[in-house]
């Protein structure tokens, strides 16, 4: 580096600029497919090897180019789609900047072969090798254009090393091609990976036919029609399809939204779709959507890869999409049959009807139904004497009798924390026992604590009670501690499950069959080795995964959605250690479901048992999803909050004492 300012050479400028357009193989595929669609193609065939890192081929039967046009097409900012700046406001094509072929040729070896329609049998070919364009030569080719890309980032190793595993890169390619296939149902679109066809749409013009090809029969049959003419002046029409609330996935990637025919990943549109479902979706589940928004006042020139747009009337667009989705679901009479697996918000376990602490104590003293009461809708709710899911209630590994026995007094009545009943001896004292015991004094975990002194431990606590039946309130040596009972119990369940994962499998009585989308099926074999490390035994027949054995620790809890989420964890992984990451994600979800929920009143013994179990964890300070389990407020902060340190405070106290 020198201190002098100088102009960069053209090759360097081209490679820097290419980084804004070509980020990964999927970026190349996106640009080339857009060119094919803009050329009026009736069929577009995409083929990639090793997720596109080795080779990409996009072939179409569009208008094609002459030799002279081909020579111009690989130059910078050359296009047939835009004349001048005045056309930017009303651009009607997917591409318009004239950058695609030039930027791809700057960072890869690019070969374009083309022939215009009704132009004889001879076409033209040109090769661009990392910015070095050759001459145009005659070549035989059917009407249309074929673009081949190899050695992507071959001369920019710093860029290539940031590419992910082939399965991950193919996931991005599949997502891009899928969206164009859904957005253009009148075009026959096919995708091939490593010589194997992933999907092929028929080009009939029916979006449901396209969805059947890429998502499978289960999803296609669940799609509900959205067709609305909104009141907003800026929105002409909202149309497409959304899935039943019960047909969901654990990621947002199946929310496909299009603005004026262009695929976009706009947060406003995605949130509007989710809001249209109201409370029919759990927070961690996302529907399928193929939704088109035709509107005015859209700026598509705000993102290098045109993935985002800017709306003049953002609020009007959001309201129109939300209303369209909501009306479609209402017209279909769809209501959620039950909460999907994995709901983890404290409110999901709200007890109804609500009672005050006095009401609950009175009910307990009166010998209420300890098994729970009906809420009028066929759902059972925890009665005042129940502890819901105690810290040792599911995936039991020992100590369950003690925790269960401590949940109620001997006469069957229920005591709240703070009632003065005696609890078992340990580091976490019941309210009646004002003296705190030193670390390790008593309790079944004392011996273990000596051998695990390096792990984190909770401070000595004296339980004061529960706040809103959601947080345990306790006094620490220097301040106040709040414990989130749901997050704490999640951590306990998670570490117990983690200790039981050993790769052992358990055969299923009847094989579980799971219909996959085209993208999931395409990478199934790549993920199979990792799945077997976890204890799964499965095979793929067409689009159906047949699971014959599962990890022993999951045998009692496995369902179709959980199995699908395991696969999704492998697909989403990008750091080279998918097995451990997938296992942790699954265990975290499993730990969530049986954990004590918010708005659940706990018996005094259960609170102490929960704190003992949390203290025995390797990491007692966070749930497996990363949320804190405890919040500490020390004495200094309390004093500051009450302004006990303001100037003259001590002197005024002395004066008051003298009076």
Swiss-Prot record:
Residues 338-459 are annotated as: Disordered. Residues 352-362 have a biased composition (Basic and acidic residues). PROSITE patterns: DNA_MISMATCH_REPAIR_1 (PS00058). Disulfide bonds: none annotated. SMART domains: DNA_mis_repair, MutL_C. InterPro entries: DNA_mismatch_repair_CS, DNA_mismatch_repair_MutL, DNA_mismatch_S5_2-like, HATPase_C_sf, MutL/Mlh/PMS, MutL/Mlh/Pms-like, MutL_C, MutL_C_dimsub. It holds the Pfam family MutL_C. GO terms for cellular component: mismatch repair complex. One of its GO terms (molecular function) is ATP binding. Keywords: DNA damage, DNA repair. GO terms for biological process: mismatch repair. The keyword Thylakoid does not apply. This protein is involved in the repair of mismatches in DNA. It is required for dam-dependent methyl-directed DNA mismatch repair. May act as a 'molecular matchmaker', a protein that promotes the formation of a stable complex between two or more DNA-binding proteins in an ATP-dependent manner without itself being part of a final effector complex. Belongs to the DNA mismatch repair MutL/HexB family. NCBIfam families: mutl (TIGR00585). This is DNA mismatch repair protein MutL.
């Amino acid at each position: 580096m020198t201190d002098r300012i100088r102009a960069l050479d053209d090759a360097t400028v081209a490679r820097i600029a290419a980084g804004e357009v070509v980020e990964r193989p999927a970026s190349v595929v996106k640009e080339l497919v857009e060119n094919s669609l803009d050329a009026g193609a009736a069929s577009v065939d995409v083929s990639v090897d090793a997720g596109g890192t080795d080779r990409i081929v996009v072939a179409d039967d569009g208008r094609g180019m002459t030799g002279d046009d081909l020579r111009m097409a690989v130059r910078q900012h050359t296009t047939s789609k835009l004349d001048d700046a005045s056309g930017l406001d009303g651009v009607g094509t997917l591409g318009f900047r004239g950058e695609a072929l030039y930027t791809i040729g700057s960072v890869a070896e690019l070969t374009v072969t083309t022939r215009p329609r009704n132009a004889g049998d001879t076409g033209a070919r040109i090769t661009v090798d990392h910015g070095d364009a050759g001459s145009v030569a005659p070549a035989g080719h059917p009407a249309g254009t074929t673009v081949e890309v190899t050695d992507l980032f071959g001369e920019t190793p710093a860029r290539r090393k940031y590419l992910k595993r082939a399965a991950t890169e193919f996931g991005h390619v599949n997502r891009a091609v899928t969206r164009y296939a859904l957005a253009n149902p009148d075009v026959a679109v096919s995708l091939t990976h490593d010589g194997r066809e992933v999907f092929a749409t028929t080009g009939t013009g029916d979006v449901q036919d396209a969805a059947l090809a890429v998502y499978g029969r289960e999803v296609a049959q669940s799609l509900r029609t959205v067709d609305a003419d909104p009141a907003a002046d800026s929105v002409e029409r909202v149309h497409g399809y959304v899935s039943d609330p019960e047909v969901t996935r654990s990621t947002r990637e199946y929310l496909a939204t299009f603005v004026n025919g262009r695929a976009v990943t706009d947060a406003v549109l995605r949130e509007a779709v989710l809001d249209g479902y109201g409370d029919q979706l759990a927070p961690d589940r996302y529907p399928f959507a193929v939704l088109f928004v035709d509107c005015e006042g859209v700026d598509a020139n705000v993102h290098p890869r045109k993935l985002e747009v800017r709306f003049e009337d953002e609020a009007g667009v959001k309201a129109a999409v939300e209303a369209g989705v909501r009306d479609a679901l209402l017209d279909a009479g769809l209501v959620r049959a039950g909460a999907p697996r994995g709901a983890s918000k404290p409110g999901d376990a709200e007890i109804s009807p609500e009672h005050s602490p006095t009401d609950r104590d009175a009910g307990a003293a009166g010998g209420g139904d300890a098994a729970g009461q009906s809420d009028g809708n066929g759902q059972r709710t925890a009665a005042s004497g129940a502890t819901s899911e105690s810290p040792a209630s599911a995936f039991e590994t020992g100590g369950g009798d003690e925790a269960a026995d401590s949940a109620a007094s001997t006469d069957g009545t229920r005591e709240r924390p703070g009632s003065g009943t005696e609890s078992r001896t340990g580091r976490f004292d019941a309210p009646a026992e004002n003296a705190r015991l030193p670390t390790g004094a008593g309790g079944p975990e004392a011996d273990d604590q000596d051998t695990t002194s390096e792990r984190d431990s909770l401070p000595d606590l004296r339980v004061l009670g529960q706040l809103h039946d959601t947080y345990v309130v306790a006094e620490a040596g220097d301040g106040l501690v709040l414990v989130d009972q749901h997050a704490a119990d999640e951590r306990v369940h998670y570490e117990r499950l983690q200790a039981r994962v050993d790769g052992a499998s358990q055969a299923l009585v009847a094989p579980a069959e799971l219909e996959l989308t085209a993208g999931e099926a395409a990478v199934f074999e790549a993920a199979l080795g990792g799945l077997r490390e976890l204890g799964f035994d499965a095979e793929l027949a067409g689009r159906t995964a047949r699971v014959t054995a599962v990890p022993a620790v999951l045998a009692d809890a496995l369902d179709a959605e959980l199995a699908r989420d395991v696969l999704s964890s492998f697909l989403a992984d990008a750091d080279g250690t998918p097995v451990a990451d997938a296992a942790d994600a699954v265990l975290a979800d499993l730990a969530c479901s049986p954990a004590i929920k918010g708005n659940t009143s706990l018996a005094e013994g259960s609170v102490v048992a929960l704190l003992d179990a949390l203290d025995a964890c390797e990491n007692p300070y966070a749930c497996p999803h990363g949320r804190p389990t405890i919040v500490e407020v020390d004495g200094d902060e309390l004093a500051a909050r009450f302004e006990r340190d303001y100037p003259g405070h001590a002197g005024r106290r002395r004066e008051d004492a003298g009076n």
